[in-house]
């Protein structure tokens, strides 16, 4: 019953987003926008976008303390992206953890902690960029919850770091085994392993990843589509669309990402046809290479969606 309700909610979200993105669209004008795209710029921007995936692989290798190797970590990252693009649920992180466990013989706790730090710093990057956008455009109502979100997360980590006994008591009360195992590993790392240099270097890796991601959006909007939005507004569009991409919805966030882009660019006076054309282009730049390469890794590894589902269920017991 719970799965059915979850599916219906996601289906409703996707349907609403698709209706929002395409409702009232003049397809003739939309096609004219597409025809005006700079073909050479599309090629260069597509190649440039791959740098973000390379950076993400380097960051993942750093999180393994340079034990797994850049190639395995790049494959793991692309696999997770590819699985998220085709699977009906957000199984990408599970596939990444499963791949690292298989290739590197890591424990469940270690792979969960690696994925936790990766996603946690991505969340921090997204929240901090959201705060910056809220300040630049004087949207105080958005700034307050975003800032509160960042501070509360770090507050919890501070509690774990400086009050380990209390933190362990809380972890022991968590009813979900997989979450309890992951939190226990995070606690152990905070108390005995990670330190300020670890956080600073991980922050630099994360900043590098997101700067490269943002660069793709800037090139697509300003160079490929010839839309004269200033840099701060393009970055605001990037942040809002990234939130849409992160929402649990359809495989690959199809529909949700496009709606987020149309909404964000509409805030700055960009017409729906131009906004949707850029959204579809950017989405294909993200979708095609990650799906093709990710599925190649998937098939080469002998992995199946059933194995990933089984790994998820075993971890949650």
Residue ranges and their predicted role:
Residues 1-78, 136-246, 279-280, 285-317:
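Predominantly cytoplasmic-facing regulatory/coupling regions of multi-pass membrane proteins
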Residues 78-95, 102:
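Short intracellular "coupling" helices and adjacent cytoplasmic loop segments at the cytosolic face
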Residues 83-88, 238-254, 258:
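Transmembrane alpha-helix interface/packing and boundary motifs in multi-pass membrane proteins
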